[in-house]
Amino acid sequence: MKIDILTLFPEMFAPLEHSIVGKAKERGLLEINYHNFRENAEKSRHVDDEPYGGGQGMLLRAQPIFDTIDKIDAQKARVILLDPAGRTFDQDFAEELSKEDELIFICGHYEGYDERIKSLVTDEVSLGDFVLTGGELAAMTMVDATVRLIPEVIGKETSHQDDSFSSGLLEYPQYTRPYDYLGMTVPDVLMSGHHENIRKWRLEQSLRKTLERRPDLLENYAMTDEERLILEKIKTEIERTDTVNEQNNL
């Protein structure tokens, strides 16, 4: 995969030279190029200007962005504009991007963009309902989430398939040595060596965590009959616990 990032602050992307993304570059699975679009601004070197019609703040000018992208050999690239008004980035979109050969990220750093920049763009994307100073942190997050899904980047394919959201559910609790730490012990089922019981426990824990923390994920989740039965059992247990607590508070 080839990724080009348009930014006024290339130095902010130093963390991408490490960990999984850095290793992917070393192994030739990934190429990342950073383009300071100020270098392509006209003689004034100004990349921003006041909005027509008045208003607060400055807008990113179209010319530096157009000229920078013209110099990138990426006619088939998917061009992503980091914008708070864009679609919310999620695991499904990361999976989608991981199948692309070329990506371009445009990071703004002002009040907004000249609307004409969007004529270059295939996707306007946001991390969520909040505003960042610039698009750099959002771009780093999206690059990291996307690159780790590229085949061969992570050793075992199941390493990311079991992640929260990859299956549609939140991930089950996990433990490592020691068995007992400060009186907190590993659930016995994980020590049993019984693979089927461990699978069922993990599935139940994933469903329970998702129901308690992100019930919205269950609305569009295609459940198996087994999962449906387990979820009903969990709901019944929660209702019983709530009833007991209410009675104790009387």
Swiss-Prot record:
GO BP: tRNA N1-guanine methylation
SUPFAM superfamilies the record matches: alpha/beta knot (SSF75217)
GO CC term (a single one): cytosol
Keyword Transmembrane: no
Protein name: tRNA (guanine-N(1)-)-methyltransferase
GO molecular function, one term: tRNA (guanine(37)-N1)-methyltransferase activity
Stored HAMAP family: TrmD
Chain's gene name: trmD
Biological source species: Streptococcus agalactiae serotype V (strain ATCC BAA-611 / 2603 V/R)
InterPro entries in the record: Alpha/beta_knot_MTases, tRNA_m1G_MeTrfase_C_sf, tRNA_m1G_MeTrfase_TrmD, tRNA_m1G_MTases_N, tRNA_MeTrfase_TRMD/TRM10
Pfam families with a match to the protein in the record: tRNA_m1G_MT
Family, per entry: Belongs to the RNA methyltransferase TrmD family.
Ligase is among the record's keywords: no
